């Protein structure tokens, strides 16, 4: 290697981002959307930043058996989410670490105290540059929720949200400094676009029109409206099948057991839809989710609540190139705009049935929507999202 080559190699090495980062969030194998998000994000960042792999400080709910969870090696510290002293001890651990930056995933429900208030002394005790990712930005917060968001935002060097609407809301409702906010989309796996039939055959659904929705089951999913809609759908499309995929959310299971799932089963029986609606009651691996999505013709998220600023399941579905139907919650409004999906009125089973029938009756239109969604979602695949996060960390740390 001559001198010029040596110089070039040295310059190239100097451009590498070598950032030590700690991530505070729930984490796998805990069954939680943010846990899955954090695992996927850190996996993707590790590929781009292999010299300093991600360290995890996980939020543990002992009431859900968290003290018995066998976490992977990258989990370096566990916070008992309902114990304030545990947060302060974790802040000390972070401050004494060699981390350059701390990334916190925020959702009110994963932190202890009223409205997750324990996050305030935790964040205010951290002496490292801090990046917050907000998974919820409420339009009409309580006084306490607003105070929490404002105080932790004041401490952050940067704030990540996943849609522009959430950024606007942080500024208008919470008074957050716009210069701190950056929009980075929800990450998704890189799924091949293609025909559904080969995947239906693998799963035993050949010859059927599949409508699906997946995720941890809870009342906020609105599946009762999807089941009611299927009464009209099967009149026109007797081979249509609705798949409701995923086990009940652990917190729901602890608080009320399987009441919601049982209510869905009663609806299925009441409407005589046993051959057209299927509840798949298990926690799905990523490969299973991808397999079901690749077999799906129409993906539905009939959520009754309209304040949701992100939906990992809808993000996955557009990333798989699915024709999606959703109620107009904030995330859906943004990602399904410009002929990338259809919106329905919340709680209106008749409207949902009409939209499903329309897409089943018009396969060319369904394909057009699916292609538009897939093209839009290419910037959301994990390598692209990870690069945005890593570049943000570089700006924050000056590296």
Range-by-range predicted roles:
Residues 165, 187, 248:
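Carbohydrate-associated surface elements
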Residues 193-205, 210, 264:
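A short helix/loop element that forms part of the nucleotide-sugar donor recognition site in Leloir-type
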Residues 351, 358, 365-379, 391:
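A short, well-ordered alpha-helix in the C-terminal region of glycosyltransferases
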Residues 256-283, 287:
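Nucleotide-activated donor-binding/catalytic signature segment of Leloir-type glycosyltransferases, i.e.
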Residues 36, 117, 218-232, 350:
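A conserved mid-protein helix/loop that constitutes part of the nucleotide-sugar donor-binding site
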Residues 338, 342-349, 358-364:
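Conserved acidic donor-binding segment of nucleotide-sugar-dependent glycosyltransferases
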């Amino acid at each position: 290697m001559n001198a010029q080559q040596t110089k070039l190699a040295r310059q190239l090495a100097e451009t590498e981002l070598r950032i030590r980062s700690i991530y505070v969030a729930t984490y796998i194998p805990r069954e939680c959307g943010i846990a899955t998000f954090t695992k996927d994000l850190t996996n993707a960042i590790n590929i781009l930043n292999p010299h300093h792999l991600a360290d995890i400080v996980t939020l543990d709910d002992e009431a859900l058996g968290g003290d018995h969870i066998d976490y992977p090696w990258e989990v370096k510290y566990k916070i008992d989410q309902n114990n304030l002293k545990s947060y302060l001890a974790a802040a000390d651990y972070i401050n004494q670490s060699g981390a350059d930056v701390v990334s916190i995933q925020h959702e009110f429900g994963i932190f202890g105290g009223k409205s997750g208030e324990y996050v305030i002394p935790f964040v205010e005790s951290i002496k490292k540059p801090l990046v917050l990712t907000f998974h919820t930005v409420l339009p009409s917060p309580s006084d306490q929720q607003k105070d929490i968001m404002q105080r932790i935002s004041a401490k952050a060097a940067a704030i990540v949200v996943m849609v522009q609407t959430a950024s606007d809301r942080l500024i208008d409702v919470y008074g957050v400094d716009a210069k701190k906010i950056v929009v980075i989309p929800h990450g998704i796996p890189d799924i091949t676009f293609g025909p559904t039939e080969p995947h239906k055959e693998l799963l035993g659904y050949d010859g059927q029109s599949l409508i699906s929705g997946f995720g941890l089951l809870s009342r906020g999913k609105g599946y009762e409206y999807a089941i009611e809609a299927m009464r009209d759908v099967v009149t026109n499309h007797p081979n249509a099948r609705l798949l409701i995929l995923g086990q009940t959310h652990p917190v729901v299971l602890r608080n009320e057991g399987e009441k919601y799932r049982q209510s869905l089963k009663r609806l299925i029986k009441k409407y005589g839809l046993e051959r057209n609606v299927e509840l798949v009651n298990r926690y799905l691996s990523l490969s299973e989710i991808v397999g079901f999505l690749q077999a799906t013709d129409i993906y539905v998220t009939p959520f009754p609540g309209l304040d949701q600023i992100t939906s990992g399941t809808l993000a996955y579905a557009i990333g798989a190139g699915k024709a999606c139907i959703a109620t107009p919650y904030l995330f859906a409004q943004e990602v399904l705009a410009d002929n990338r999906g259809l919106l329905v009125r919340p709680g209106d089973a008749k409207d949902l049935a009409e939209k499903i029938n329309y897409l089943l009756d018009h396969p060319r239109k369904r394909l057009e929507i699916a292609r538009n969604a897939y093209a839009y979602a290419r910037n959301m695949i994990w390598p692209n999202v990870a690069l945005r996060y890593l570049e943000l960390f570089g700006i924050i740390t000056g590296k």
